[in-house]
Amino acid sequence: MDALLQLKGIDKAFPGVKALSGAALNVYPGRVMALVGENGAGKSTMMKVLTGIYTRDAGSLLWLGKETTFNGPKSSQEAGIGIIHQELNLIPQLTIAENIFLGREFVNRFGKIDWKKMYAEADQLLAKLNLRFKSDKLVGELSIGDQQMVEIAKVLSFESKVIIMDEPTDALTDTETDSLFRVIRELKSQGRGIVYISHRMKEIFEICDDVTVFRDGQFIAEREVATLTEDSLIEMMVGRKLEDQYPHLDNAPGEIRLKVDNLCGPGVNDVSFVLRKGEILGISGLMGAGRTELMKVLYGAMPRTSGYVTLDGHEVVTRSPQDGLANGIVYISEDRKRDGLVLGMSVKENMSLTALDYFSRAGGSLKHKDEQQAVGDFIRLFNVKTPSMEQAIGLLSGGNQQKVAIARGLMTRPKVLILDEPTRGVDVGAKKEIYQLINQFKADGLSIILVSSEMPEVLGMSDRIIVMHEGHLSGEFTREQATQEVLMAAAVGKLNRVNQE
């Protein structure tokens, strides 16, 4: 079968790093090609070379059988290559239709925008995705998951021959994911080629026909998905066997460190639980169940309307994140790029940002040597892959960005560490490193709350698990009691089992 798109022998270097070396990718008509690899393997760089954002140093790009070079995203888009980025690229103040057709609005014979036609065309695109809202709605009023579906509708509006999807389900619900897969199958039947970039093994084996593996900027293999298992694919990605993906540390927790009684706030109703020293408490539940809201009320980022929180036996009132930090409660956001990191600043500046008090003299000036020493220690401890601590953090892979975000929280020497979706968008190799770090914190007596949508992660890492449903606590389970079936029953409200100490 002739490829619609073929990249061969692609090299790309940046100062101090060879991002791609002999990389290759084929996209076939009517098939979905998964592109997988650890963060930093070169997947994003390859997409930027393909769409013309980066100029390749060596290699060839064949588009519909002809040697081609794209000058930028616009030329690749006009040629028939569409890309759905992991980061949303929408304007909240405009309607869905205005976002979809921005810069190419329909005009009537008088040169004015034909709003009726534009909304009708946009509504048809939304209907293809089985979405229930209309295109005259403002994008800013949509959930993150619905905004991602608008991004997909926008790319479909170009009638692209090849569509690149970069972690497209990262913010989608199961229903939205099912709708996306239905659309992908429809696109396949029309002879379009899909590049599907994802860390989610289940999705790759469900929707993809072929898979291309990158490792350290190099092409490792192209295989039919049907010939592989999850384990064999992961081993190709990381170059080693993965034993025990969730390395649980079986230490007995200590005395109660945090006690939450009848806590209420936006999206949180009458929640009570305890957390012990050296314990990992998993928080499970469906999207919108109130898990993140509970953590933000606890940390001080959202207002508490009633209830009590005690830390080491003393009542704590957190009216702001600063109060949370001052009391030893650190929250690592689920959205590290929006809430957790300053992408234009360096690794060092991001890591030490909340701990500057520890590196400040009485007059307010910084002890730069102390700061550099501490940052260097964390970079080594966390195995952060960066050319230097002065590197802009936005240039690091997702897994390394997440390590920096966690290190920043630990620099303030907290008593309670809240990790909200700590491995979202992180590859399997970096996940294992993060799990090992979490176990190290646990062994040191740190109390950890692990919020995750990945049930195997919650089940594998937690000592106890509580489940949220519609702002309430719907279940509490020991490690031995917890199964995927039990957690799901509690998450949908079919089971209510809460045993408080």
From Swiss-Prot:
ATP binds at G37, E38, N39, G40, A41, G42, K43, S44. One of its GO terms (cellular component) is plasma membrane. Keywords: ATP-binding, Cell inner membrane, Cell membrane, Membrane, Nucleotide-binding, Repeat, Sugar transport, Translocase, Transport. Its EC number is 7.5.2.7. CDD domains: ABC_Carb_Monos_I (cd03216), ABC_Carb_Monos_II (cd03215). Belongs to the ABC transporter superfamily. Ribose importer (TC 3.A.1.2.1) family. Pfam families: ABC_tran. It comes from Salmonella choleraesuis (strain SC-B67). This is Ribose import ATP-binding protein RbsA. It is a peripheral membrane protein.
